[in-house]
């Protein structure tokens, strides 16, 4: 029986050690394991949330990019329309200026022709008067008259 008392004390020490471990060692270990498990779960949740936020941000970026593209396209079209309008307006103004210059030149030419005609009439009238004076100063002779008229024709 010595063997029985040893086994009894070993069992008693085992149960005391088990109780001590359950009472003082086991709770901090389970608490640390639970905290670690919670940290891992929180990290995974944060990673999932970050992934979802990234997807939302990428969606917003693609929407903003599409909006910017369409806005840029619209601005380019508007600028082209405005440029065409400015060119067309300049063309109309140039055409009006050309027409005005041509009309002014035609008017100036007509006035110059009119002045030339007036000057020519004055010259013809002066020559006619001069010829009439010469005819009247000389005696009346058909041959002399014809010669004077030929000279007047040559001067005209």
Curated annotation (Swiss-Prot):
**SUPFAM superfamilies reported for this sequence:** F1F0 ATP synthase subunit B, membrane domain (SSF81573)
Which InterPro entries does the entry mention? Answer: ATP_synth_B-like_membr_sf, ATP_synth_b/b'su_bac/chlpt, ATP_synth_F0_bsu_bac, ATP_synthase_B_chain
Q: Name one Pfam family in it.
A: ATP-synt_B
Predominant place of localization: membrane
User: Recorded GO terms, molecular function?
Assistant: proton-transporting ATP synthase activity, rotational mechanism; proton-transporting ATPase activity, rotational mechanism
Q: How does it sit in the membrane?
A: Single-pass membrane protein
Q: Which residues cross the membrane?
A: 7-27
Q: Is this entry keyworded Transmembrane helix?
A: yes
List where in the cell it is found: Cell inner membrane
GO cellular component terms given for this protein? plasma membrane; proton-transporting ATP synthase complex
Asked if Chaperone is a keyword of the record, the answer is: no
Superkingdom of this protein's organism: Bacteria
Keywords from the UniProt entry: ATP synthesis, Cell inner membrane, Cell membrane, CF(0), Hydrogen ion transport, Ion transport, Membrane, Transmembrane, Transmembrane helix, Transport
Free-text function comment from the UniProt entry: F(1)F(0) ATP synthase produces ATP from ADP in the presence of a proton or sodium gradient. F-type ATPases consist of two structural domains, F(1) containing the extramembraneous catalytic core and F(0) containing the membrane proton channel, linked together by a central stalk and a peripheral stalk. During catalysis, ATP synthesis in the catalytic domain of F(1) is coupled via a rotary mechanism of the central stalk subunits to proton translocation.
Please give the subunit comment from the record.
F-type ATPases have 2 components, F(1) - the catalytic core - and F(0) - the membrane proton channel. F(1) has five subunits: alpha(3), beta(3), gamma(1), delta(1), epsilon(1). F(0) has three main subunits: a(1), b(2) and c(10-14). The alpha and beta chains form an alternating ring which encloses part of the gamma chain. F(1) is attached to F(0) by a central stalk formed by the gamma and epsilon chains, while a peripheral stalk is formed by the delta and b chains.
**Entry-linked HAMAP family:** ATP_synth_b_bprime
Q: Which family does it belong to?
A: Belongs to the ATPase B chain family.
Matching NCBIfam families = ATP_synt_b, PRK05759.1-2
Protein name according to UniProt = ATP synthase subunit b
Q: Which organism is it from?
A: Bordetella parapertussis (strain 12822 / ATCC BAA-587 / NCTC 13253)
Q: What is the lineage of its organism?
A: Bacteria, Pseudomonadati, Pseudomonadota, Betaproteobacteria, Burkholderiales
């Amino acid at each position: 029986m010595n063997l029985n008392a040893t086994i009894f004390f070993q069992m008693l020490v085992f149960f005391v050690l088990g109780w001590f471990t359950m009472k003082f060692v086991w709770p901090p270990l389970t608490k640390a394991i639970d905290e670690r498990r919670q940290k891992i779960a929180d990290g995974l949740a944060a990673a999932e949330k970050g992934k979802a936020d990234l997807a939302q941000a990428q969606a917003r970026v693609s929407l903003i990019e599409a909006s910017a593209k369409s806005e840029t396209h619209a601005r380019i079209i508007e600028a082209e329309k405005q440029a065409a309008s400015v060119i067309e307006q300049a063309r109309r103004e140039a055409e009006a200026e050309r027409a005005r210059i041509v009309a002014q030149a035609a008017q100036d030419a007509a006035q110059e022709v009119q002045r030339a005609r007036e000057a020519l009439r004055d010259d013809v009238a002066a020559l006619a008067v001069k010829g009439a004076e010469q005819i009247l100063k000389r005696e009346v002779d058909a041959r002399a008259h014809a010669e004077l008229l030929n000279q007047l024709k040559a001067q005209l």
